[in-house]
């Protein structure tokens, strides 16, 4: 483009006007209310974007991100730090902005984007998180058909600013779980065309940043579907094979065997893998599954690994799940592909966390919320926070949700809060996260 772009679009307005002194930097004297997204508006006055795609991504994501940082009680300094990091590092790798009629590389994060926001809630407070698939325009025009190169370019930039990021596992696991340059060279054009046609979503990597008050924790998700189509193995076999390839001393083998036994019993072939981008000796591996049979009985079966997890944390967590499932009114039944496409319904998901020295895998359940009115979800969450010693979250959850979707009718909307994930330990209590979809 000839010129660079800055300034906020004229129709962007402040939504929620509550703020506190330490978050806004105000003196505390009687003044006009300060909008929650003031940091976004302020930075917009000083940011230049080299193209319209980055400009649109900034104005699409940053207002909600700014509000979440205020709601999470981040200091004013960290609010600006994390918003700047989004503008400088993340927005440049979100790819062409997906507009109607524009034939560009597609990802389904947040429902229809290459980026997704989520919040984690614990008794200690809330944490804002951002997940995205690094992508550049080359993936849309055929130069990088499987979007293999953008993630490496992103990590080279991230490591300059976040010194704690260690990408050793990225290199080790990519070889086992993603289509490599060598794999692509070994496939003929007919095979490549088949994979490009069969996989409407070609995502192989997703990066997630936990924006903690103590600093950033980076995670990477590996989706082995395309690799498995080329090699003939199942996703679950690929994930466990990759773990064993990097866990050469076998610290995780007994945990893997426990999960594998359940997968075999339940006939689960598809899976994907996540790890923390830290020293490999200290990382957590998480094996994920999705199941279109959305029933409480099926969720219970997966939560307990078919009865293999009988510890106190699993038992207490299961009782809480039963209550939440009933109160929320999770839409149940076998989920056909047409329901996912036409009605926007989602499967249940779980992950199983493993770490060296851990005796048992730790399950986490993702309950699909699409199809349930947003205000109903918010009321259930508010009551849950009240029961489980999270009074600050209970007080503001409904108000915050409305601020994220300003002007939207949350009594009628059913597709903004997409997932509720839940885990439990006696030490920390309930661990919940809400994953948000963007308005269509």
Swiss-Prot record:
Residues 1-33 are annotated as: Disordered. GO terms for molecular function: aminopeptidase activity; prenyltransferase activity. One of its GO terms (biological process) is alkaloid metabolic process. Coiled coil: none annotated. Substrate binds at residues 108, 116, 223. It comes from the Eukaryota. It holds the Pfam family Trp_DMAT. Changing residue 131 to G: Does not significantly affect the enzymatic activity. CDD domains: PT-DMATS_CymD. Signal peptide: none annotated. InterPro entries: Aro_prenylTrfase (IPR033964), Aro_prenylTrfase_DMATS (IPR017795), DMATS-type_fun (IPR012148). PANTHER family: INDOLE PRENYLTRANSFERASE TDIB-RELATED, PRENYLTRANSFERASE ASQH2-RELATED. Accepts only dimethylallyl diphosphate (DMAPP) as the prenyl donor but shows broad substrate specificities toward its aromatic substrates. Also shows tryptophan aminopeptidase activity with preference for linear peptides containing a tryptophanyl moiety at the N-terminus. Belongs to the tryptophan dimethylallyltransferase family. This is Cyclic dipeptide prenyltransferase. It comes from Aspergillus fumigatus. The gene is cdpNPT.
């Amino acid at each position: 483009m000839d010129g660079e772009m800055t300034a906020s679009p004229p129709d962007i307005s402040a939504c929620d006007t509550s703020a506190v002194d330490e978050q806004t930097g105000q003196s505390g004297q009687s003044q006009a209310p300060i909008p929650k997204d003031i940091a976004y508006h302020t930075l917009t006055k000083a940011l230049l974007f080299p193209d319209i795609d980055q400009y649109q991504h900034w104005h699409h994501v940053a207002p909600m991100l700014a509000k979440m940082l205020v709601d999470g009680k981040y200091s004013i300094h960290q609010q600006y730090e994390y918003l700047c990091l989004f503008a400088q590092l993340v927005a440049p790798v979100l790819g062409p902005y997906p507009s109607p009629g524009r034939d560009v590389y597609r990802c389904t994060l947040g429902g229809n984007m290459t980026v997704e926001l989520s919040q984690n809630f614990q008794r200690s407070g809330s944490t804002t998180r951002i997940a995205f698939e690094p992508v550049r325009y080359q993936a849309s025009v055929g130069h990088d058909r499987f979007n293999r190169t953008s993630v490496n370019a992103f990590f080279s930039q991230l490591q300059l600013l976040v010194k704690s990021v260690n990408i050793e596992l990225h290199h080790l696991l990519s070889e086992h779980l993603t289509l490599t340059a060598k794999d692509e060279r070994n496939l003929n054009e007919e095979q490549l065309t088949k994979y490009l046609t069969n996989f409407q979503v070609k995502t192989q990597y997703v990066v997630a940043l936990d924006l903690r008050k103590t600093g950033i924790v980076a995670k990477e998700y590996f989706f082995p579907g395309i690799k498995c189509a080329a090699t003939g193995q199942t996703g679950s076999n690929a994930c466990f094979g990759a773990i064993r390839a990097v866990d050469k001393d076998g610290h995780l083998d007994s945990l893997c065997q426990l999960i594998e036994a359940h997968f075999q019993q339940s006939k689960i072939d598809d899976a994907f893998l996540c790890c923390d981008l830290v020293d490999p000796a200290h990382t957590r591996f998480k094996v994920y599954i999705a199941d279109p049979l959305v029933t409480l009985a099926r969720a219970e079966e997966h939560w307990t690994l078919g009865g293999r997890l009988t510890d106190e944390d699993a038992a207490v967590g299961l009782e809480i799940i039963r209550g939440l499932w009933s109160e929320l009114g999770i839409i149940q039944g076998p989920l056909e592909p047409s329901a996912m496409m036409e009605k926007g319904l989602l499967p249940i998901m779980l992950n199983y966390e493993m770490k060296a020295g851990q005796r048992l895998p730790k399950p986490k359940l993702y309950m699909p919320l699409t199809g349930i009115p947003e205000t109903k979800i918010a009321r259930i969450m508010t009551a849950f926070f009240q029961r489980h010693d999270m009074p600050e979250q209970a007080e503001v959850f409904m108000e915050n949700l409305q601020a994220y979707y300003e002007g939207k009718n949350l009594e009628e909307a059913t597709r903004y809060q997409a997932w509720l994930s839940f885990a439990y330990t006696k030490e920390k209590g309930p661990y919940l996260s809400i994953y948000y979809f963007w308005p269509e």
